[in-house]
Swiss-Prot record:
Belongs to the RNA polymerase beta' chain family. RpoC1 subfamily. Its EC number is 2.7.7.6. It is an enzyme of class 2 (transferase). The keyword Acyltransferase does not apply. Keywords: DNA-directed RNA polymerase, Magnesium, Metal-binding, Nucleotidyltransferase, Transcription, Transferase, Zinc. This is DNA-directed RNA polymerase subunit gamma.
Length: 624
């Protein structure tokens, strides 16, 4: 059967109606039989190790445990595809359908959804315009609620009554001379469902809009909050009573597996225990209702069913946490979804991707700001397709298999090809958590020995990285478009300013600041070569390199360009006239020789070899 391609624009998460939940789990077999309801708490038969019928692993509901094999073994081949066994009712198909086929449990009494009851904010409490404490009192069978005050003068709609108050009113209703009628009182999730059903959302929305226009302050904020919830219900075409469950879905069995261990014992998902509690209590409640058990016993069983469903959806949200063996809290549906180890963050957002790697970062002070050091071992793995392509294209290798063998043997040719491949091919480095766009930047890779990624110290503030064991991920942009985009938009040398403040984020720090200070510092104790004259800057640096002048020694260097010098007086400290008519003016940091008519012949600047080195470095960088 050809797979149909389904295109969609977005995924919408909304409340599911009881009919929708039944549709998820209910299927009509080719023989007309409707299956889907899980009615037994059993999982597998411990003697035959086969799933129990109508249980949590039922093959009739969820599909066969083995490919193309029914429960009783009558059909065992792919040629029987699609047949439903007459004896056991199992459809002959692939076992992987057990990863997506759902079931459902029909509840003997309605149950409030704990997310909407105990969530922050409580949507049920907001919609009913009642305090959360009162709603909880109703749901957990501590208080009655008036659903219809009838002709009783003292009763009000949604008023809470305790046991004694209700008994008193009941006595009045059934008294011989009583004229009370139309009084309706409820308790538990059934009463809550009735209250939610009575809500007319459109009318409430109109009424709230009028009240908001007339009110202010705290009251107005509360009304707006309620209106927002009501408008969302209207917008998604959901009904408030759907927050009370009559049917609960059973997730596919392969998502809550049961596996046999070496010693013959079984390891099972916590969900199976939570589902088993729900089914046991549900079946017991149905039986009690059948035999018309006393109201107090039925009510207690309904409360226990509510608590069992609460634990299944979100264990520990309300009441005592349900624990398994060795007092470990059981993992509910919410626990599987939420948090760092949950389905979204761990498996969907945090999944491993191809052409990516991860390693510890170390400082690479010899790198340029747009470069990173990539370990050879990692690079050959990441760029393997490009290397194989280049080998086949240029080096008379005939096929991929041959090229892979060369790579496995670490042939010297491979490293030359890898060097060619990575030249001009940027890689992207990412450090979690990526809190702003500079958390992922592009670099040109340089092959390095070892197993650590080398990073330029100036890009650390953008990544909020340091070298105390931080790890970073590498990603390779594959297409030409992706490479061009990485180079133009994401290269580290183009991300100098912070997107948040507009201030420079690449600023010298630590060793760099210390080095600049040390080069330009004054040290009166540095006397070696002090006072010497040099014809140009290069001569002074050469003298320092030969060791004849200290780094901080004051020397005079001929420099005929413009010199800016703060704190220097316009008046010379001394003026000396020579026999040839020239005049030498000495300032604090300059010595200028001029002709009689003021024409400059030469200028010497008082500086240190360190300052010359600093000036040359900055000047070279600015020119390039």
């Amino acid at each position: 059967m050809a797979k149909q391609e389904q295109r969609f624009d977005y995924v919408k998460i909304a409340l599911a109606s009881p009919e929708r939940i039944r549709q998820w789990g209910e299927r009509t077999l080719p023989n007309g039989q409707v299956v889907g309801e899980v009615t037994k708490p059993e999982t597998i038969n411990y003697r035959t190790l086969k799933p129990e019928m109508d249980g949590l692993f039922c093959e009739k509901i969820f599909g066969p445990a083995k490919d193309w094999e029914c429960h009783c073994g009558k059909y065992k081949r792919v040629r029987h595809r699609g047949i439903v066994c007459e004896r056991c009712g199992v459809e002959v198909t692939e076992s992987r359908v057990r990863r997506h086929r759902m079931g459902f449990i029909k509840l003997a009494a309605p149950v409030a959804h704990v997310w909407y009851l105990k969530g922050i904010p409580s949507y049920i409490a907001i919609l009913l315009d009642m305090p959360l404490r009162d709603v909880e009192q109703i749901v957990y069978f501590n208080s009655y609620v008036v659903l219809n005050p009838g002709n009783h003068s003292e009763l009000q709609y949604k008023q809470l009554l305790n046991e004694d108050q209700w008994m008193e009113i009941e006595d009045q209703i059934y008294a011989e001379e009583s004229d009370l009628e139309g009084i309706e009182v409820g308790i538990g999730a059934e009463a809550l469902q009735q209250l939610l059903q009575d809500l007319n959302l459109n009318e409430e929305s109109e009424k709230l809009r009028q009240e908001i226009a007339e009110s202010k302050g705290q009251k107005r904020a509360k009304l707006i909050k309620r209106l927002r919830v009501i408008d969302n219900f209207i917008g998604t075409e959901s009904r408030p009573e759907w927050m009370v469950l009559n049917v609960i879905p059973v997730i596919p069995p392969d998502l809550r597996p049961m596996v046999q261990l070496d010693g013959g014992r079984f390891a099972t998902s916590d969900l199976n225990d939570l589902y088993r509690r729900v089914i046991n209590r549900n079946n017991r409640l149905a039986r009690l209702q059948e035999i018309l058990a006393p109201e107090i016993i039925v009510r207690n069983e309904k409360r226990m069913l509510q608590e069992a469903v609460d634990a299944l959806i979100d264990n520990g949200r309300r009441g005592r946490t349900v624990v398994g063996a060795n007092n470990r809290p059981l993992k509910s549906l919410s626990d599987i979804i939420e948090g760092k180890q949950g389905r979204f963050r761990q498996n969907l957002l945090g999944k491993r991707v191809d052409y990516s790697g991860r390693s510890v970062i170390v400082v690479g002070p010899n790198l340029k700001i747009h470069q990173c050091g990539l370990p050879r071992e990692m690079a050959i793995e990441l760029f393997q397709p490009f290397v194989i392509h280049r080998l086949i294209k240029n080096h008379s290798i005939n096929n991929i298999k041959q090229a892979k063998k060369l790579i496995q043997k670490n042939d010297p040719l491979i490293w030359d090809v890898l060097e060619e491949v990575i030249e001009g091919h940027p890689v992207m480095l990412n450090r979690a958590p990526t809190l702003h766009r500079l958390g992922i930047q592009a670099f040109e890779p340089i092959l390095v020995e070892g197993r650590a990624i080398q990073l330029h110290p100036l890009v650390c503030p953008a990544f909020n990285a340091d070298f105390d064991g931080d790890q970073m991920a590498v990603h390779v942009p594959l297409s030409i478009e992706a490479q061009a985009e990485a180079r133009m938009l994401m290269l580290a040398s183009g991300n100098i300013l912070s997107p948040a403040t507009g201030q420079p984020i690449v600023t010298p720090s630590q060793d760099m600041v210390l080095g600049c200070y040390y080069l330009t510092a004054e040290n009166p104790g540095a006397q070696k070569g002090a006072g010497r004259y040099f014809a140009n800057l290069e001569d002074a640096i050469r003298a320092f390199e030969q060791g004849s002048v200290d780094l901080h020694a004051w020397v005079w260097v001929r420099f005929d360009g413009e010199v800016e010098s703060e704190g220097e007086s316009d008046e010379p400290e001394s003026v000396v006239a020579a026999d040839d008519g020239t005049v030498t003016k000495t300032y604090r940091f300059r010595r200028i020789r001029e002709t009689e008519d003021g024409q400059r012949l030469s200028q010497y600047v008082k500086t240190t070899p360190g300052r010359i080195l600093f000036n040359n470095t900055v000047q070279t960088a600015l020119i390039h």
